[in-house]
From Swiss-Prot:
Organism of derivation: Sus scrofa (Pig)
Domain Vitellogenin: 28-662
Cysteine disulfide links: 174-194
Any one Gene Ontology cellular component term annotated for this protein: endoplasmic reticulum
Alphabetical list of InterPro entries matching this protein: Lipid_transp_b-sht_shell, Lipovitellin_superhlx_dom, MTP_lip-bd, MTTP, Vitellinogen_b-sht_N, Vitellogenin_N
Catalysed reactions, as listed in the record: a 1,2-diacyl-sn-glycero-3-phosphocholine(in) = a 1,2-diacyl-sn-glycero-3-phosphocholine(out); a 1,2-diacyl-sn-glycero-3-phosphoethanolamine(in) = a 1,2-diacyl-sn-glycero-3-phosphoethanolamine(out); a cholesterol ester(in) = a cholesterol ester(out); a triacyl-sn-glycerol(in) = a triacyl-sn-glycerol(out)
GO MF annotation list: ceramide 1-phosphate transfer activity; cholesterol transfer activity; lipid binding; phosphatidylcholine transfer activity; phosphatidylethanolamine transfer activity; phospholipid transfer activity; phospholipid transporter activity; protein heterodimerization activity
Signal sequence region: 1-18
GO BP field: cholesterol homeostasis; lipoprotein metabolic process; phospholipid transport; plasma lipoprotein particle assembly; protein secretion; triglyceride transport
Assembly information from the UniProt record: Heterodimer; heterodimerizes with the protein disulfide isomerase (P4HB/PDI). Interacts with APOB. Interacts with PRAP1.
Protein name: Microsomal triglyceride transfer protein large subunit
Highest taxon in the source lineage: Eukaryota
Function: Catalyzes the transport of triglyceride, cholesteryl ester, and phospholipid between phospholipid surfaces. Required for the assembly and secretion of plasma lipoproteins that contain apolipoprotein B. May be involved in regulating cholesteryl ester biosynthesis in cells that produce lipoproteins.
SMART domains cross-referenced by the UniProt entry: LPD_N
Length: 894
């Protein structure tokens, strides 16, 4: 009995050791042939999960797996052979019927004979402890075909115990988590952790950016240390943040099922795996199991010059308001990204002056080394003969979706050279600031070019001797928003003269809340309350805005409220409107304002009944569950009724994240002499000036001057028409996302989203002494096209989903002031044109031989035009300003 017990324990001990030896990964039995059924399928849709509404394809086959060699030093060192046989390609959507692109075609016709032969050649997999040590295949096989074999081979890499580790497979070097439970193992691959060389870029701005999500789960059913069934599912979903109808999803599945086992070839003996492989076939070579990049053959693709000729007519100046112009702009950018410098230069040099600005927009927006070299060779900054082209180039740089260090380095080099136009020199510095901001947002603050640009901006601001240079560096800092620049801004805000002081405060206004420290707020309070010196109204009101928009304290709010009633007349009304707007629109400061208003000393009739024409109002353009867009308009007048500043802002929100889409600020000063009026306190010695400062998609652009100085004003009044001055005009690449994906199945996927717009912002200021009336106009006209393109490619069959949306919108702001009486009459109008919105969806499946299936859908709606509401006082005033002419009661001569 004791002897039996000892023998039993020895048996258990040896059995346990054997199991332990096999728990690290799959283990094949000697001299057995495993016959399996394998399929990989992929389908694309807009995220609705309806298979009948999707496009895609399925590749299926039989698979033979045998163990060729096992190391005599350990069971977990194995060499296995995997052979794909009996390949089929068919629709994933079985309801396609007669429309199936595979109908009547055999695998050699679909895949091509040479590709099919390569696909069915065996591969060898060297596994140690369940992990891939080497992957062996034949050289010179098409990468796309090798990737399909890699996708199958990667399924055999797994471990039988729970835990988290890193594995290298077709997806790259990835973090994976195993969950083992009895005869089932689940492998979760963190796709965002995978290290693999793939091209791609994205727009870092959260509002204009794309949200993508990827998951990969593989479930193994294990029996006798080998797979009975494997099911892998990989999902990639994408959506545009502010327009969620631009969305798509790729679902890729792999299924592997054991059908039977039968007698197989005997194990090969030997200690070195290299000798075994050579004995099997000396042509085998070790290649990476990580998926390799391949380019599909492009049949009938046009050259750059051919494509340019096909889209050129749509980019003529008269056609820029049409959506076809923006679509042509986007497609041309895609062609430019694969073009060489010489090809691009050839087109630039051959074009006429009318179409060159649009061509410069496109070449700059391509953002490739070749396109940058071409445009820099083409433009001559030492000449003043092509200023429009230089400015269009610089604006396109400022709006760049994914700028690199080389672009910034090029602009720094240009700035240190000579210029034919001082306006262009200013624009270069302003755009340098914008690029610094974008590169820092992309974790590039320590790049040498960024460090050099910071020194250039801050050093230039500190040493500037001319007013124009100070303004230029302040505008650059307004774009860059460098924390280290705040002490300089505080110095200029408090001590400098009016325009510089105002620009310094508006620059501080652009900083995020964490940078508006107690020290900053103390300075803003001193400016607003004029404790050290007298400041212009524009400076004081902007300082108040900085305080109120950045977590104001109880005493800060109370002191601002108590000041109302002690300010100049129009400033009283303006500050009162600001407070009322905060309360009505429930801005962050509204809770603190309500707390303070519980005190009677702050909340009384005298304070809240101040008259005047200045105003502030915020409202919604559109409001949805995920996003919203708002407009705000505040206008400050001088005591004599002349416009001092109008500020129009449009913000786009995704959740609580804002994008400052548009800001148009019109400023005027020193015009009181025209109507023999008395200037306000602190503004007695201001030169006559009017200008417009634009900000577009978070990028401050160079301000435009209407007139500067009394003589310039008089000449403009006597000679100028009411034609508006163009402030910003051009084509902008606003959204730019490109992602190349290596699917676990071996297929290649691409997800791209592009958004472009044609924009035209113009402004005018009309002044009539005869009618004692002034008019200010700001016109915004935009045409927007957004395209999403998702494809899955095997090199012999391709499925794709294209979604696009387009719209045209116009917004006009008119301020009319009649100062023939006092109080003067003011009417503000904000009108929006009717907005057509169109959405298109195209789904397709296409063989490399040309046969295809296409499905198209279209949706169109019209949003009626409207006049945006402003405060009630404005509505009443407009009725007086535009009162109908009284009808004559007499029909005779007298």
């Amino acid at each position: 009995m004791i002897l039996l017990a000892v023998l039993f324990l020895c048996f258990i001990s040896s059995y346990s050791a054997s199991v332990k030896g096999h728990t690290t990964g799959l283990s094949l039995n000697n001299d057995r042939l495993y016959k399996l059924k394998y399929s990989t399928e992929v389908f694309l849709d807009r995220g609705k999960g309806n298979l009948q509404d999707s496009v895609g394809y399925q590749i299926s086959s039989n698979v033979d797996v045998v163990l060729l060699w096992r190391s005599p030093d350990g069971d977990d060192d194995q060499l296995i052979q995997i052979t794909i046989k009996d390949v089929k390609v068919e629709n994933v959507n079985q309801q396609r019927g007669e429309k199936s692109i595979f109908k009547g075609k055999k695998p050699p016709q679909i895949i091509r004979k040479e590709n099919l032969e390569a696909l069915q050649r065996p591969v060898l997999l060297h596994l140690i402890h369940g992990k891939v040590k080497e992957f062996y295949s034949y050289q010179n096989e098409p990468p796309a075909i090798q990737n399909l074999k890699r996708g199958l081979a990667s399924l055999f890499q797994m471990q039988l115990s729970s835990g988290t580790t890193n594995e290298v497979d077709i997806s790259g070097d990835c973090k994976v988590t195993y969950q083992a439970h009895q005869d089932k193992v689940t492998k979760i691959k963190a796709l965002d952790s995978c290290t693999i060389e793939r091209s791609g870029f994205t727009t870092r701005n959260q509002v204009l950016g794309v949200t993508s999500k990827a998951t990969s789960v593989t479930t193994y059913k294990i029996e006798d240390s080998f797979v009975v069934a494997v099911l892998a599912e990989e999902i990639h979903a994408l959506r545009l943040n502010f327009l969620q109808t631009i969305a798509g999803k790729i679902v890729s599945k792999q299924k592997l099922e054991l059908k039977t086992t039968e007698a197989g070839p005997r194990l090969k003996s030997g200690k070195q795996v290299a000798a075994i492989i050579k004995a099997v076939d000396s042509k085998y070579t070790a290649i990476p199991i990580v998926g390799q990049v391949f380019q599909s053959e492009c049949k009938g693709c046009s050259s750059l010059s051919q494509h340019w000729q096909s889209v050129r007519k749509h980019l003529q100046p008269d056609n820029l308001s049409k959506t076809e112009a923006v679509r042509s702009f986007l497609t041309f950018i895609q062609h430019l990204r694969t073009a060489k410098k010489e090809e691009i230069l050839q087109i630039l040099k051959a074009e006429n002056k009318d179409i060159l600005p649009q061509l410069v927009d496109a070449v700059t927006s391509a953002q490739t080394p070749d396109s940058l070299d071409a445009i820099l060779d083409f433009l001559d900054f030492k000449s003043d003969s092509n200023i429009i082209l230089q400015e269009r180039f610089l604006y396109a740089c400022g709006f760049a979706s994914h700028p690199d260090e080389e672009l910034l380095r090029a602009l720094i080099s240009k700035f240190k050279g000579s210029f034919g136009s001082n306006d262009i020199r200013e624009s270069v510095m302003i755009i340098i600031g914008a690029l610094v901001r974008k590169l820092c947002q992309n974790e590039g603050c320590k790049l040498k070019a960024v460090v050099d640009a910071k020194k250039l901006i801050l050093g230039g601001l500190e040493r500037a001797e001319k007013k124009e240079d100070t303004m230029m560096y302040l505008l650059a800092l307004k774009n860059a928003r460098l924390p280290e620049g705040i002490p300089l801004l505080l110095k200029y805000a408090e001590a400098a003269e009016g325009p510089i002081s105002h620009l310094a405060v508006t620059t501080l206004q652009r900083y995020d809340a964490p940078f508006i420290t107690d020290e900053v707020k103390k300075t803003m309070n001193r400016i607003y309350h004029q404790t050290r010196k007298v400041h212009e109204k524009t400076v004081r009101t902007t300082a108040a805005a900085v305080i109120l928009n950045n977590n104001p304290s109880y005493m800060e709010v109370k002191n601002i409220l108590l000041s109302i009633g002690e300010l100049p007349k129009e400033m009283n009304k303006y500050m009162l409107s600001i407070v009322q707007d905060i309360l009505r629109f429930e801005m962050p400061a509204s809770k603190m304002v309500r707390r303070v208003l519980k005190e009677m000393v702050a909340h009384n009739y005298d304070r809240f009944s101040k008259s005047g024409s200045s105003s502030a109002y915020t409202g919604y353009i559109e409001r949805g569950p995920h996003s919203a867009s708002t407009y705000s308009l505040d206008i400050l007048y001088s005591g004599s009724g002349i416009l001092r500043r109008s500020n129009l802002n449009i913000f786009q929100y995704v959740g609580k994240t804002p994008l400052h889409a548009i800001q148009v600020v019109i400023e005027a000063q020193g015009l009181e002499a025209l109507i023999a009026a008395t200037p306000d306190e602190g503004e007695e010695n201001l030169d006559s000036y009017a200008g417009l400062s634009p900000l577009l998609f978070d990028v401050q652009l160079r301000p435009v001057t209407f007139f500067n100085g009394y003589s310039d004003l008089m000449s403009k009044m006597l000679s100028a028409s009411s034609d508006p001055i163009s402030v910003v005009k051009g084509l902008i690449l606003l959204i730019d996302h490109s992602q190349e994906l290596q699917l676990q199945s071996g297929l290649k996927a691409n997800m791209e989203v592009q958004g472009g717009l044609a924009i035209d912002i113009s402004g005018s200021m009309e002044f009539s002494l005869w009618y004692r009336e002034s008019k200010t106009r700001v016109k915004n006209r935009v045409t927007v096209v957004i395209t999403g393109d998702i494809t899955v490619d095997s090199s012999f069959v391709k499925a794709g989903l294209e979604i696009s949306a387009e719209t045209e919108a116009g917004l006009e702001f008119i301020s009319t002031v009649q100062f023939s009486q006092y109080p003067f009459l003011v009417c503000l109008q904000m009108d929006r044109d009717g907005i057509p919105y169109r959405q298109f969806e195209t789904k397709y499946e296409r063989l490399s031989t040309g046969r295809g299936y296409v499905s198209r859908k279209r949706k169109e709606i019209l949003v009626a035009g409207s006049e945006f509401p402003l405060h009630q006082e404005n509505s009443e005033m407009c009725k007086v300003v535009f009162a109908p002419e009284p009808e004559s009661s007499s029909s005779g001569w007298f």
